[in-house]
Amino acid sequence: MSQHLRPLHELRDEARAAFARGDAVRARDALWSALQHTIAREEDYVAMTGELREVLTRLGDHRGALTASWYAGTEQSQRPLVTHVPPIDRARTLLAWADREPDAERQKRLYGRAADEYEAGGLVAQAAIARERGQDFARARALWSRLAQLLSSSGADFYAAGLARFNLARTSLRTGDTAAAREAVFASVHLLEEAADRYETIGQRERAFDCYQVLIAIGRESGAFEHVLEGYVNVIRILREDHLRYYALQSYEEAVAAAEKQGEISAAATLSREMAAYARKEGLPAVANFAMMTQARLWQEVSGAALRRGAPTEIGENALLAAVIAYGEAGQYRRVGDVYRGLSELPLEEARKKHYGRARARYVDAQDLPIDAAPLPAHLRHEVGFPEVWHVDLVEWEQSGSASQAAGDVILDPSQWSEVTRRRAMLARLTALSLEAQEAAAGAERVPAGVFVALAEQLSTVELYTILSPLEHLFRRQEVPVRVAVVRALSRFLYKRTFITLREALTDPEPTVIHEAAKALEELRFPHAFDPLARIYRESQSAAVRASAVRALSKIDTFEAAEMLLGVIRHDGSEERAAAVEALKRARGMKFIDLARGGLAELSGPAQAAVRDVLQARAVSV
């Protein structure tokens, strides 16, 4: 964007000169252009936001002035503005002051004032979160209770209702009301399971994933391991299906640790066995060996615990036999012999004890093979914790697609986002505030479509998940240019949720929207995009859309994508086959090449010729 703008120093000089002669509008416009240089030096950019704050204050645009001050301003520069803005902007500002306040008592007061302002603005969830941050759990609980009743009575959003109930359970525990907490946990689990089922049914696995993550949190808060286990089993399933193997393996490790901590050793051993099989399938032998050794250790612990509590001896015996298998698969033969010795010492019938004794004798001189056994390496781990969706997603629900609010969250979080991202968010918020002012003055239906298009273009530069909700909200407008701009913007958002709106766009009554959506598909080429792309390919009646899906799939280097593309070449129409061949010629991944070479002899004439064409173009000998 910056290369099409006038030089920064010229724009700043123009703004200063205009402001000096009393032309605040000209100064504002020049500074607006200058701020488009979002990769400028930080000291220059901070100075410009300060200048813009002064100009907008002169023009009476206090919300815009406060927004500019949010970027790098101080409490001193913001205090004169907060009395002139709506409660939500006051609340956000007070929250930011509280977050950086060193004095604990003043910090609590600021959080309380922020909560009061949120309540005044009718924003119950955000008020409750502010109460929690100020350690006022009793009043937070009352707010969560009010929100939970509201959502449950409407019956429209199981997910939001489940989150509200979970927050009610959390705050009930912190205020000592365990009975209310149990009741809220029960309701929350029921609602979240219902929501997850619905999301999976309509193909929104990423939303179901959030439900299962909350189930894990519920189990940890309440001490109910069954919720932890249900959550992890489904989280791992979705991560595996989305080919996010490192995330899946890390989740396996977390699940095993959680099961051990709860004393559910048998469940931990079973999870370790599954982890070992998955790691081996994914070509990670060290992780597989680590999981196998963990499994063997845990089965021995299961056996010891069973015998200590007086359970039938067969339970301990079966657990030790599982340990034998695990050690054997890992090549730890001396340890196999040690486990057989333990089996021969169990209080079993004499024939079985002798059998295990003979087995032990076969391993007297056996040695353990040297193996590499290590957990998932640190550089492959995702150390950023799972977001508190029980707060984050309720805030999104409450914001109802507001671009100004979503962008404001980004500006006010310098610890989370880069300078460039926050600058772009500031520009998007200023655009959104201008649009809101026009809507308030003339009505939304009388605001020119170009204003909404400009907002979509500004939002597209932010490229964060939190911006998807405002874009989804914009897509519901009637003006075709707005929907086209939204779809074009979505091509920059590499998230599975992006496909929800794109699938709507692909069935839009306007051909221009469909065309832009098909182009956007080709940009969404990340591993876990396979499932939605495959679904679009199967469901679409448009050859052009199917071809776009094929081109996107050709850039995803996974076995599943390669297998599907080979199926397209073998069984589907000539247009789809041609699109697949041309796309695969330009692709860089090797999964399709490996699969095609191995199965070339089994292909029929046209399909074999097409695959040979791809292999020759990629300079692969056949």
Segments from the language model and where they lie:
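Amphipathic alpha-helical scaffolding segments comprising HEAT/armadillo-like alpha-solenoid repeats
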Residues: 407, 423-442, 464-474, 495-507, ...
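Residue-level detector of extended alpha-helical repeat arrays and alpha-solenoid scaffolds
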Residues: 124, 423, 448-452, 483, ...
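Conserved hydrophobic register position within alpha-solenoid helical repeats
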Residues: 164, 339, 426, 448-451, ...
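Short inter-helical turns and helix N-cap capping residues of alpha-solenoid HEAT/ARM repeat scaffolds
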Residues: 448, 478-479, 509-510, 541-542, ...
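Hydrophobic/aromatic side-chain positions at a characteristic register within alpha-helices
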Residues: 19, 57, 99-102, 106, ...
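Alpha-solenoid repeat junctions
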Residues: 347, 434, 459-463, 490, ...
